[in-house]
Amino acid sequence: MKFSQIELEQAIQSIPYIQNLSALYFSQEQVSFEITFDFEELDKPIDFNIIIDQAYPLKISDSESIRFYLKDDEYKQFSHVMLNNAICFHNQHCITFHKKLQQDFQAIKQWIVKYIINLEKDEHYEHLITENCTYKETYFSFQFTDVDESFSQNEIGIVTNTFLTKSKYKDKDMYHYLVQSFTHNMTQRNCQWSSFYSNKENNLSGIYVFIGKRPSIYDRFSFSNWQEFKSLFNQEMLSEIWKITFSIQQKYIPIFIGYNTKNQDIHWQVAMIDLKDQFFKNTQGIYELCDKKINWVISKNSSYHYFFGRGAFHPNLTDKKVLIIGLGAIGSQVAKTLVRGGCKNITIADYDVKEPENICRSEYNFLPPYTNKTDELAGILWSISPFVELSSIRHLATEYIKFDLPSECLNFLSEQFSEFDYIFDCSTDDDLMYRTGKLSLTSTIFNLSITNHAKALVCGISPNHYRFVKHQFDNILENDTLDLYNPIGCWNPTFKASYNDIAIMVQLSLRTINLMIQENNYQNFTIQYDDNLNLKVERF
């Protein structure tokens, strides 16, 4: 321990609202003792068991290394009390034992005042505290989204699920499923995944029961035994569940318990049930819930607004159709960032193939060493977001546009390009930039180019993007055209810059573009380093 028993006793005795230090056990691995909180505002004292781990006063992972356990179960009704009666709290960093101990005891006193004395409620919604169990020594997870239609009280139906992947979770295997639909009679409510995911095969059926009310104790803890559902599952409901279980030819079935949250969302808690060992029995048409533990598994509302709730681009970008031309160092990073930023409809275009030397500064993987850039990047983008509608083209946007075409073909190309709201031209192809400048487009083009060694980035915006970019490279910026990287063989030389160099420029340019879209104020701009390596965005 980083403190002695005497230091601990003296520190506790110095806290005026702490009494009755007893049952003290002190070792180098762990310390435990009992104390009482007692101060003027309390109707009666509150007793605690306390355990301190040897890392104290430092945290262990993201948890405090001191734990306060309430001795009386009556306090489980209050916020932030866990199933084991421990109070969940997070305190400030402190490396001084005496100061940290006072700080932690003060945090518990503040919790008592706020929740027990003043009976305050947290405004933000919290899910029920649930023990996530294994089924047959395996963990399960189910991802779902909001659906457009509502559910009726006590409605029962079929859930279809798609297997996603298998992973390690803690020390066991975990199987991950995507919820596809909820079907009752002839009404099917579909989760709002992209077509790439919604078109996948359904390979696990389940049952859903919408009860409306949270299946909880103190409105905080999930039921842990099936008999606790007695007041929520009537005979008619159990009869319907019984019939459905026999129509599903599986060894196990997930059962989804649905209820309304105070945010007016619907949450689904999922339990795994074994058809050979049901959670209720049928005795001559009379159904009775068994005294059995509920095997709750992980379920998550991964709707778009939660999935991107921690940060996304402006809706005027994410809700629009986007075309990205050129999927090299710049374009692949642009594509990946836009998808992580919540963009829902993206088309990627590149005629080229990925080779091993492309990987070090792009968003591609080593395996397979050779493949079409559009094909590999599409797979990467789908693995990031289950909401992006993605398509790809290889030649139209990069080659056909350069042909000597009659006016009707140029009009056709203009119509094709104008289907997009925003076009990110990351090809660094001057010929392509010139041709897009000659088309009559309703879309906005952002042409992104980087100088050698990534000392500057230029963003030209239509309709004058060609003129602006050429002027910057030919007359304004310093661009070393001699010290280039020459691949082995007969290839065009390319600029020198690391992944880090390029990413800094790309991320700042996308931040600037997102802001311009939000403000509806489009200006050409450059990004350059000054003499002190500070980046400066200059608009024109």
Annotate the PLM regions.
Residues G326, D350, R394-A397, C426-T428, ...:
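Active-site proximal loops enriched in glycine and acidic residues that flank catalytic Cys/His/Asp
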Residues I12-N91, H98-Q102:
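Compact alpha/beta protein-protein interaction domains typified by the UBC
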Residues L119, E137-N282, E415-Y422, C426-F540:
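Glycine-rich phosphate/adenylate-binding loop
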Residues A312-V353:
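Glycine-rich adenosine-cofactor-binding loop
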Residues E64-V159:
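Domain-scale recognition of soluble eukaryotic interaction modules
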Residues I266-V322:
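N-terminal charged helix/coil linker that caps or initiates catalytic domains
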Residues Y351-I393:
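Glycine-rich phosphate-binding loop and adjoining beta1-alpha1-beta2 segment
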Residues I384-N411:
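S-adenosyl-L-methionine
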